[in-house]
């Protein structure tokens, strides 16, 4: 891909790091990756993996490419992290249960985290941390429908929601009820 685009290829194992226990090393990664990206105008960086202290490849869990995109967005101080997937953003309900659920236009990081924890899986929940900390919004977009606006994920919104309930997600064997009043 990098050759086709004429961009520099950056091997994730040289800029994304894990500790000896296999945990992501955010501090070292941000330092090395930020420095590398300062010296690079355009690059292709594959997702899903990095390197351990011994240099061997270590992978993120399922959805690791979402995390990689978030890490790179933070390191290059992006104004937006666009995550392209096979759906037009986050939906108000699981399409396997509810026919033709509508996409959510805008959702906060907190609301998305709660939906992800309860089974909504359009974006890996760990992909939220790096960009949220940096104040970078996320836009979930559909590769098969690039004109669709997707779902914008932000810290907070002054926009009045279309619905009282942002979304519904479920997980067998788990119940949580949270009610907030503004």
Where are the language model's segments positioned?
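Short, glycine-/Ser/Thr-/acidic-enriched flexible segments
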Residues: 50, 65, 77, 88, ...
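Terminal amphipathic helices with adjacent charged low-complexity linkers/tails
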Residues: 91, 140-157
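Flexible, glycine/charged-enriched surface loops at secondary-structure junctions
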Residues: 123-126, 137-146, 179
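A conserved regulatory-domain signal marking ACT and ACT-like small-molecule sensing domains
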Residues: 149-182
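Nucleotide/pyrophosphate-binding catalytic subdomain
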Residues: 1-128
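Active-site scaffold of zinc-dependent metalloenzymes
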Residues: 134
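A broad, low-specificity signal marking well-ordered, structured residues that form hydrophobic/aromatic
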Residues: 43, 58, 138, 151, ...
């Amino acid at each position: 891909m990098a050759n086709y685009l004429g961009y520099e290829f950056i091997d994730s194992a040289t800029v994304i790091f894990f500790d000896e226990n296999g945990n992501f090393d955010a501090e070292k990664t941000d330092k090395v990756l930020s420095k590398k990206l300062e010296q690079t105008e355009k690059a292709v960086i594959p997702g899903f993996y990095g390197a351990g202290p011994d240099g061997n490849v270590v992978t993120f869990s399922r959805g690791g490419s979402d995390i990689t995109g978030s890490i790179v967005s933070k390191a290059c101080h992006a104004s937006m992290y666009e995550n392209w997937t096979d759906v037009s953003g986050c939906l108000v309900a699981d399409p396997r249960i509810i026919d033709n659920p509508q996409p959510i236009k805008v959702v906060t990081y907190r609301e998305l985290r709660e939906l992800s924890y309860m089974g909504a899986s359009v974006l890996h929940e760990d992909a939220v941390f790096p960009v949220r900390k940096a104040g970078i919004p996320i836009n979930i977009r559909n590769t098969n429908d690039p004109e669709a606006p997707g779902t914008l994920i932000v810290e907070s919104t002054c926009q009045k929601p279309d619905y009282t309930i942002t979304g519904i997600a479920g997980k067998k064997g788990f119940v949580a009820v949270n009610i907030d009043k503004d």
